[in-house]
Amino acid sequence: MKSRDKAILKDLHRFRCLSRDDIIDLHFQGLKKAVTSCNTVMKRLRRDGSVDVNVSQQPYIYFPQPSTIRKTSQKIPHFLAIVNVYKQLLQYEKPKLFKVEPKYGKGYMEPDIFTIWRQSPFFIEVQNSIYSKKMMQEKLSRYEFYFHSLEWQQEPWQPNKSKYFPSLLVITDSQYDIYSPNFRIFQAKSIHDFMNQMAVKA
């Protein structure tokens, strides 16, 4: 199997699913006939039984085989939104680490993403829908609970000397009245919007 095939399958497992255009952006950038090349490769991987596909959507949505989600799952737009955040991060710098829906234990937060990007750790929440103030406070309280547990100091990515609690970045079209005295919270409509906010502060 070619290294690009392996990289595509690795991303399909990591992101749960990818649209044909996502695969082009991540693995066929710069090719003259990127669409044709991608279609040919994905057709072969499908024939080999390495991937599954939902052809009822345009562009096609591809899944690893076996897949952890159904081809008709309601969470597909959510996972594709996570891919979109990853692609936006890449435009500035490739993340050193990028985990999709990492698990931290009972009672703790369930971020959509944990990433180390531009030498900084971030929890990222990708919000496609509007949450009530109560729901946002409940989300935030789980981060606070994790902060006070000090378990984050044992994370394998932590430096030996200083320990850092990740910043929380909420990707949302709505602004929420949320604050923590223990860690930084950012709200932005996109990674580009977030970078513009940082540029203004700098």
Summary of predicted features, one role per range:
Residues M1-R70:
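Nuclease-adjacent, charged terminal/linker segments that flank catalytic cores
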Residues S73-Q74, K87-F122, I130-E138:
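Active-site metal-binding core of divalent-cation-utilizing nuclease and nuclease-like domains
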Residues N128-F183:
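Catalytic cores of nucleic-acid endonucleases
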Residues N182-A202:
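Charged, structured surface patches that assemble and position nucleic-acid processing machinery
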